Regions:
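Serine-dependent protease modules
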Residues: 2-254, 259-262, 267-271, 297-301, ...
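Flexible, small-residue-rich helix->loop connector segments that border functional cores
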Residues: 29, 283-286, 315
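Conserved PDZ fold ligand-binding element
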Residues: 71-75, 275-296
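Secondary-structure boundary/capping motif
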Residues: 290, 316-317
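Exposed beta-strand face motif in extracellular beta-rich ectodomains
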Residues: 311-313
């Protein structure tokens, strides 16, 4: 199943949203997309500083991306290193145990799967997040503050693009949409939709105590991952074989100032790696992979998602 702008899943809801007459865009999008958004509950175990274990529980949202039971959500919702069980709650209240197939902390994305047998699962229709502009309508659907408020819709606009945020653990996320559609705890992993009810992002975070500032991961980032998982049951990431530091960080920390403002400064090339075979050397600065501009380790990783093992790619240094 190739993931295009148009739905490829036979059960994907490709209804055209028409807000003529008394129907609002929000109402039309709700009718089209709401049944594709699910609630997620997790049970896990955490340890305190004295190594005492206690049971934890978590809540979040997810989006059905295939009628075969594949669901896209955030890594921090279902993090396999912290959870022992994951349960999906469909829009009609049906509960199903889910298995985590893939997750990535840096991207804050995860793919889980439920058994589709006997279920009428409606997959979302995918939009093209590269076509999203500031000022476009943005509609978030998820479960803010828990399952009691499941299938909640909030509406706003795309307020910004290519946003970089720093998370509580000090890690950064890049290339995000900013929206004023309300995103609250529990909304994580839910969908951000355009005015046609097409999925354009996965909601991930809100800015501290600020109202009206939420962030969403553009859906195009997840498409190559979903494509591989739905076809092969797993995602094999491409490894370049370099250890590097963001140029922006190097320019702050380093003894010398580099001749460019952004990119990845190669600290070490792993022997026998694809980078080694291609002739990359220590002190090279990677600025482009294929058609994708590289400004940091995070954007380098994102650029490599579009390639499979064995593909040839041009790297600019």
């Amino acid at each position: 199943s190739t993931l295009n702008q148009s739905p490829t899943d036979k059960n994907a809801n490709s209804t055209t949203v028409n807000n003529s007459g008394s129907t609002t865009v929000e109402k039309a999008v709700a009718e089209k997309a709401m049944s594709s958004v699910v609630g997620i509950t997790t049970v896990g175990v955490s340890e305190d500083m004295f190594s005492n274990q206690k049971q934890t529980s978590g809540l979040g949202s997810g989006v059905i991306v295939s009628s075969e039971g594949y669901i896209l959500t955030n890594n921090h919702v279902v993090d396999p290193s912290k959870t022992t069980s994951v349960t999906v709650i469909l829009s009609d209240g049906t509960k199903k145990e889910a298995k985590v197939l893939w997750s990535d902390k840096t991207l804050d994305l995860a793919v889980i799967k439920i058994d589709p047998k006997g279920l009428d699962l409606k997959a979302v229709e995918f939009g093209d997040s590269s076509q999203v502009s500031i000022g476009d309508k943005a509609i978030a659907i998820g479960n803010p503050l828990g399952i009691n408020l499941k299938s909640t819709l909030t509406s706003g606009y795309i307020s910004g693009k290519d946003r970089v945020i720093t998370l509580q653990d000090g890690s950064t996320m890049e290339g995000l949409f900013q929206t004023d559609a309300a995103i609250n705890p529990g909304n994580s992993g839910g969908g951000l939709f355009n005015d046609q009810g097409q999925l354009i992002g996965i909601n991930t975070a809100k800015a501290g105590n600020s109202d009206g500032i939420g962030f969403s991961i553009p859906i195009n980032l997840a498409k190559p991952i979903l494509e591989q998982i739905i076809q092969n049951g797993k995602f094999e990431s491409v490894v370049l074989g370099v250890q590097g530091i963001d140029v922006t960080k190097y320019n702050v920390l380093g003894q010398e100032k580099l001749p460019v403002d952004s990119g990845v400064y190669v600290h070490e090339v792993l022997s026998g790696s694809p980078a080694d075979k291609a002739g990359l050397k220590s002190k090279d600065i990677i600025t482009k992979v294929g058609d994708s501009k590289v400004t940091s380790n995070s954007t380098l990783k994102t650029a490599l998602l579009n390639y499979k093992i064995g593909d040839k790619v041009k790297i600019e240094v």
